[in-house]
């Protein structure tokens, strides 16, 4: 009996809430703007070039024609840690895969210190 009474009360309360909110199409906090806010000297957000809070590139930094490998390697080299030296020239890395693997091993082992004598990376 109590369960039926509780279900009935929930149903009645739900119908009251639905009827009361029928008159409003939008929630109270939603505000329509007829015209975009225009402040002198500022561009609207959809026109702004700094949407992602990144720096704007100068024309000197922009590289128009990149091949597939360069398109991948350029961002990696830009974000490369400054403390690590590149031992092998960039052109040699593209030509010879064996030298690339040996350079990678030498940089990893150089960072390990005494563990490089064991021959394990962990």
Curated annotation (Swiss-Prot):
GO terms for cellular component: extracellular region. Its main location: secreted. Residues 24-40, 57-122 form a propeptide. The keyword Secreted applies. Residues 1-23 form the signal peptide. Expressed in brain and ventral ganglia but not in the retrocerebral complex (at protein level). It is found in: Secreted. GO terms for biological process: neuropeptide signaling pathway. The modification Phenylalanine amide is found at residue 53. It comes from the Eukaryota. Neuropeptide stimulator of juvenile hormone synthesis. This is Allatotropin.
